[in-house]
Amino acid sequence: MSNSAAVTPNDLSAFWMPFTANRQFKKAPRMFVGAKDMHYTTSDGRQVLDGTAGLWCVNAGHCRPKITEAIARQAAELDYAPAFQMGHPKAFELANQLVQLAPQGLDHVLFTNSGSESVETALKVALAYHRVKGEGSRFRLIGRERGYHGVNFGGISVGGIVSNRKMFGTLLTGVDHLPHTHNLAKNAFTRGEPDHGLDLADELERIVTLHDASTIAAVIVEPVAGSTGVLIPPKGYLQRLRDITKKHGILLIFDEVITGFGRLGTPFAADYFGVTPDIMVTAKGLTNGVIPMGAVLVSSEIHDTFMQGPEHVIEFMHGYTYSGNPIASAAGLATLETYKEEGLLQRGTELGPYWADALHSLKDEPNVIDVRNIGLVGAIELQPIAGEPTKRAFSAFVKAFESGFLIRTTGDIIALSPPLIVQKHHIDELVDGIRTVLRAIP
């Protein structure tokens, strides 16, 4: 059977798909069989414009030869090397390049295989760091309502999406949550950072007072919350969190799995907002989504704290079979080179105003209650159908696919994050397509 041959529902039962209504999908499957640059090819031969960079990850566009050829060369030369007590050059080279790209002071890298693993790694680093310092009482972790930090137990514990948590009973103990910053009444149709909501950062002081600073290890937030609907921080909010965490000796972790590698027009959101965390979590765009890989960057102060014991003792009991995998490292190096050569990390700044104008032209379309944007990411929030939340946005998703473009929905929000190679005519096509869809769905 060719890769473009039709797939019948009987072929689909074995794969229990993630974050998918499996029975619904398998009655009317939507299949991709190819991709190039800004487009997917479906199993029936249609071209679909990618408005979401896959799942927020294909920042350089699909099937870029520099990246795919680097993977093929590496697979033929060195397919696997253990990272425990052994090494290979490309992992060290990639770590060095990440440090050069990252905000000053984030000088050491731990490799993982996904954003979820990167979050787990960051949380473990934070807890262990305080123990090594003799501050074992610092066991609490602070997340945020509507935050998404992957699907492992640490991530869903500090995460704040109720539907991701409620099925699994008791999660990590000692976790608290900041309030989210989304306020439609005051901030609807804002371009960039909202004016209202800075005071919500001061809720961290309340949490510190409630639990005592001596019990809190770290605060973790997404600089821009992506998976919950593109929630952009109010002006000054992240700096206020930074000030409070420093005041109380609490580590600040930025989850940049989505915002990293150019999404906001800077290498990282930390650069955009001018706020440097103690730990930064990345994945997705690190390898352009071609192969699983994540990276956690930590400050020299954290790293050096672990390096105080005898040299023959393992400093941090953590890692993965595929940490710094040779093929993933080759993909990461080729991806970073592509970003640099093509100026992709700056595209969000260059195209941001055009992107904003295009998105906000949807303001008066049916059922639109908010449009928000920053860099090359945006969201269109829809009025839910009474008694049927999520149905309107999902109808838009299906209609969009049928019309030749891919969008992402979360709740009743359409989220957009095109590959950074996007051109103005792609933006026009995407936004005009969404306009047509909004007018067509109930």
Sequence positions of predicted segments:
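Conserved N-terminal phosphate-binding loop of PLP-dependent enzymes in the Aspartate aminotransferase
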Residues: 2-442
